[in-house]
Amino acid sequence: MANPIVGRVWKFGDDINTDAIIPGKYLRTRDMQIFGTHAMEGIDPEFTKKAKPGDIIVAGTNFGCGSSREQAPLALKHSGIACIVAKSFARIFFRNAINIGLPLMEADVECQEGDEIKVDLFKGEVLVPEKGIFKGNKLPDFLLDILNDGGLVAHRKKVKGEHK
């Protein structure tokens, strides 16, 4: 995992649910590219045509609410989103994102869509040029380890290999 993560901002509001992140009609596939090309389609059907790899989502409260579908963070990851910063996350979305290696941070950040920001997960900070540094909730070391290893499965394989 790169740190800090630098990218262009896409802004979303409160209560962005998993049905908006990846509509249910795409859930029968296992093709990650299909998930990636339909990310955020429930809010902005053109999102994946505009978003670029390395971009960052900044959102309000309760991001990822709704169903517990793991496909929601997978869709964002495979669309090229590098990180999500939100005031708060639905807990199951938060853990699903960590499990698949999608970095996120809880922070209340003042920025505009299109701004380039820098997210430092190790410090728990978001730098918005000309607006300053916004403190967020630093992830515990064990979650940072999972993200650094690329997700929970890769992390468990690494840990298991270290204990042989």
From Swiss-Prot:
Site (Critical for substrate specificity): R28
Motif interval(s): YLRT: 26-29
Recorded GO MF terms: homoaconitate hydratase activity
Involved pathway(s): Organic acid metabolism; 2-oxosuberate biosynthesis
Cross-referenced InterPro entries: Aconitase/3IPM_dehydase_swvl, AconitaseA/IPMdHydase_ssu_swvl, IPMI_Swivel, LeuD, LeuD_type2/HacB/DmdB
EC id: 4.2.1.114
Origin: domain of life: Archaea
Keywords: Lyase
Reaction catalysis annotation: (2R)-homocitrate = (2R,3S)-homoisocitrate; (2R)-homocitrate = cis-homoaconitate + H2O; (2R,3S)-homoisocitrate = cis-homoaconitate + H2O; cis-(homo)2aconitate + H2O = (2R,3S)-iso(homo)2citrate
GO biological process per UniProt: coenzyme B biosynthetic process
Disulfide bond annotation, renumbered to this chain: none
Family according to the record: Belongs to the LeuD family. LeuD type 2 subfamily.
Function: Component of a hydro-lyase with broad substrate specificity for cis-unsaturated tricarboxylic acids. Catalyzes both the reversible dehydration of (R)-homocitrate ((R)-2-hydroxybutane-1,2,4-tricarboxylate) to produce cis-homoaconitate ((Z)-but-1-ene-1,2,4-tricarboxylate), and its hydration to homoisocitrate ((1R,2S)-1-hydroxybutane-1,2,4-tricarboxylate). Is also able to hydrate the analogous longer chain substrates cis-homo(2)-aconitate, cis-homo(3)-aconitate. These reactions are part of the biosynthesis pathway of coenzyme B.
Quaternary state and interactors: Heterotetramer of 2 HacA and 2 HacB proteins. Cannot form a complex with LeuC.
HAMAP family in UniProt: LeuD_type2
Protein name, UniProt field: Methanogen homoaconitase small subunit 2
The species this protein was found in: Methanosarcina acetivorans (strain ATCC 35395 / DSM 2834 / JCM 12185 / C2A)
